[in-house]
């Protein structure tokens, strides 16, 4: 399939490599930053442009992998230029945006959402990445399914309404968790302990949920309702009231989700120190 890749960021970079790896032809890369477009195009042996009105007009698929904030405007402009009478697929890759962002005059449009965290500098194997698709018709969905199956063995059809919850779940499981890693790193820095000491703990925590439910795998002072430990740790964060608030709320949530009926609640946890 001849594909135009609109975007040159983290997802666009890794998706472009995956598509080329299974013998699709990425014919062109667009980015509003010309150097970014050229860099990715060089990796994919493709043409490049920083102007939407200079896209290849006869591609079979236009993949939008740009920031959510600009996606509607970019889609409107591209479809206005190229969609009328076209048999090409027009698809975006955003987890949180509905497929009806496409103009209705577009014949074939939808969503192809690979649920994974992506970075330009870290290559990933798309084979096991779940890909969620949605098309504006059965014909479109079938085309998207074939495209997705060309690089992933885990392809699911999911509506825009349900994909909102999938994306929310991913934010909890990935983005918030990574922020906690960052907080942990900041806690260690003043005492000169490298973040690498946390990696075995992080790895085992991730491995456990392959065998146990997250609730069964939960450990820590909030589960045990260990007020002494929790209040002592809150005291260590006395100069960081936002972190205290986060610690308190997470501890309350953990405890409420895991406690037995005969265990006390920790909603009165003292955080005044």
Predicted segment positions?
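Rossmann-like NAD(P)(H) cofactor-binding subdomain of soluble oxidoreductases
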Residues: 42-123
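NAD(P)+-binding Rossmann beta1-loop-alpha1 motif at the extreme N-terminus of oxidoreductases
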Residues: 1-54
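Short, polar loop motifs at secondary-structure junctions
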Residues: 32-36, 94-98, 138
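Interdomain hinge/lid region at the active-site interface
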Residues: 189, 203-262
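Short polybasic linear motifs
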Residues: 259, 263-267, 271-273
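Internal alpha-helical scaffold of NAD(P)-dependent oxidoreductase catalytic cores
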Residues: 36-43, 123-168, 173-210
């Amino acid at each position: 399939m001849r594909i135009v890749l609109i975007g040159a960021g983290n997802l666009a970079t890794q998706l472009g490599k995956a598509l080329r790896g299974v013998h699709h032809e990425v014919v062109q890369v667009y980015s509003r930053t010309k150097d970014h477009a050229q860099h990715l195009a060089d990796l994919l042996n493709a043409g490049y442009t920083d102007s939407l009105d200079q896209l290849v007009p006869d591609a079979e698929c236009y993949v939008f992998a740009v920031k959510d904030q600009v996606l509607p405007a970019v889609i409107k402009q591209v479809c206005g230029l190229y969609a009328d009478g076209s048999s090409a697929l027009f698809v975006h890759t955003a987890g949180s945006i509905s497929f009806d962002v496409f103009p209705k005059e577009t014949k074939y449009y939808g969503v192809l959402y690979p649920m994974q965290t992506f970075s330009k500098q870290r290559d990933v194997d798309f084979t096991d990445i779940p890909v969620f698709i949605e098309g504006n018709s059965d014909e479109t969905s079938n085309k998207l399914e074939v495209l997705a199956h060309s690089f992933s063995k885990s392809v699911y059809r999911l509506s825009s309404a349900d994909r909102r919850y999938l994306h929310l779940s991913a934010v909890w499981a990935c983005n918030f968790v990574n922020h906690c890693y960052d907080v942990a790193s900041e806690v260690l820095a003043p005492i000169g302990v490298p973040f690498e000491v946390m990696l075995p703990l992080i790895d085992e925590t991730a491995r456990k949920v392959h065998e146990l439910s997250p609730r069964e795998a939960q450990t820590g002072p909030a589960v045990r309702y260990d007020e002494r430990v929790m209040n002592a740790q809150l005291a260590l964060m006395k100069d960081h009231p936002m972190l205290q608030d986060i610690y308190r709320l997470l501890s309350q949530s953990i405890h409420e989700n895991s406690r037995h009926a005969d265990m006390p609640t920790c909603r009165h946890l003292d955080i005044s120190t």
